[in-house]
Each structure stands twice: as C-alpha cells, then as structure tokens.
Amino acid sequence: MRDQLDEIQKHLDDGYGRAQQLDKVELPKRFYKDVGVAPVDGGFVVTLDGRQTRTPGHKHRITVPVAAIATAMAEEWSTQGEFIDATTMPMVRLINSAVESGEEMVPAFREEVLKFSAGDLLLYRADTPQELVGKQEAAWDYALTVLARHFGVSFQPTRGIIHQPQPKATLDRLAESLGDENLLTLTALVSMTGLTGSGLLTIGLLHQLFTPDQVWTAAHVDEDYQIGHWGQDEEAIHRRAKRRVEFDTAVMVVAALRP
C-alpha cells in the first residue's frame, strides 16, 4: 500500500502518470487542433478533435462528474503550444492520477490523510527561537481550536520531535469526517496534504473551516520565518509558486465536487 501511495504522489509531482513519463528535454508535439467538452452518461468528457481523452498510454477513458473540472482540463489542453508540457497541466495530471489509481485506492488515500493528521505539522512545535514559537502559536493554535470546536475533539500538541499520541476519540472522529468522500476528492486531498504537510489543515479546508489562503499561510509558517531571516532565491520562489498552483487545483476539485 505504501508503494502505491508513493506512486500516486509521483504522478502528481511528475506530470503524465506511470504510463508515460514526461521527457524533460523533448516534449511531445501537439497532435490535435480542437478541444471540446461534451456531456455523456455519468458526467462530462474532454475531447481532442472529437475524441475522448484517455490517461497516458490510452489505458482509461476519462469521464468527470462535473462540468467545471472538465472545463478546467479543456483549458489546459487548449493552452498548449506546439509541444505538450504536462507540467503546465495540473488539473489533467490530477485527474489522470485518480483514474489510473482506481476505486480500490480509496481506503489507502483516506488512511494517508489520517496518518498525516496523527503526526501533524500543527502538533509538533519548535522550542526556540521565541519569535518562531510565537508565529507557530498564533497560526496553529487558532487552527487547532477551530478544528476542536467543530469536531468536538481535543488535540495534544508538543514541542520537539518526540512522538505524542493523539486521543483515539480524536482520530476516530477525523476518520468519520472523511468517510463519504469519493476517489477524485480523496486524490485531491492527498495532493493537498502532501503540499502542505498537514492532514488537519486539509480536513479543515474540506469542511470549509479555513480558506485556501489561511491553509497555505499556516502551512508555511516555518518557511516564511526562514525567508524573513535569510531571504529566498529565485529557484525557491518558482518552486513555491508551482506548488501553489497545484494546491489551488486540488482545492478547485474539492470545491467542484462538494455537495
């Protein structure tokens, strides 16, 4: 199961999925002219020159349940130039990953978010320096308080890296909060959890307890502290911006599929 989870995260990071790795030197040429969205039984499809898109390697036809996701995918296909650069297609990559993984991965994806939550970023605090301690407390205590009140649970944050078990009732309640989510939503939640390092922030965003900006800011307290003291190079700026696009894509999927 761990290998399968690593594989799905690799899809999200690298682009085109297990069946076709993106060549970073020679990108595939664009092979289509027209991009469309069409309703079908069970949802919507993206068409390239009238043909339904498939996952890399042509293994699976792609149908999504809502028009908003299909439209976002179509826009990514439309904006490709002479060559197809999958790194500029976060929605296509995310949906490909979900479809390639299959429904059998739903329990594993749910468990991945819960595993992060049990040893969450918000629960392990710095001892020093005091400035960082204060920044963590301001952002993370607020988040934990909101979560605790909403779900009727308690958390046991700690300082340092020594493992601090969380109450079983808390973990059980968090598990219940993910119990009805579908494959596409859970794929997006796994992506968000990996990008933020926090299952708790992800669950809070799922239940509309936090805005995307609040989650992103809380997830980067430590990084922003370091930037404030040491600065940030261009590569780091580019990398963070790319991750924010991936995060926003996952947020869009969750919002589009929300009842």
Residues of each region from the PLM?
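Generic secondary-structure signature for well-ordered alpha-helical cores
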Residues: 79-82, 148, 152, 205-210, ...
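An N-terminal structural lobe/cap that precedes and organizes the functional/catalytic core
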Residues: 2-104
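Expand to "…catalyze enediolate/carbanion chemistry for C-C bond making/breaking, isomerization
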Residues: 2-7, 44, 220-221, 227-259
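Conserved aromatic-histidine-acidic binding/catalytic patches
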Residues: 61, 128-135, 184, 188-192, ...
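Internal, conserved structured core segments that host functional sites
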Residues: 107-173
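An internal, amphipathic alpha-helical element
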Residues: 165-234
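Conserved active-site and cofactor/substrate-binding residues in soluble primary-metabolism enzymes
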Residues: 64-68, 72, 104, 138, ...
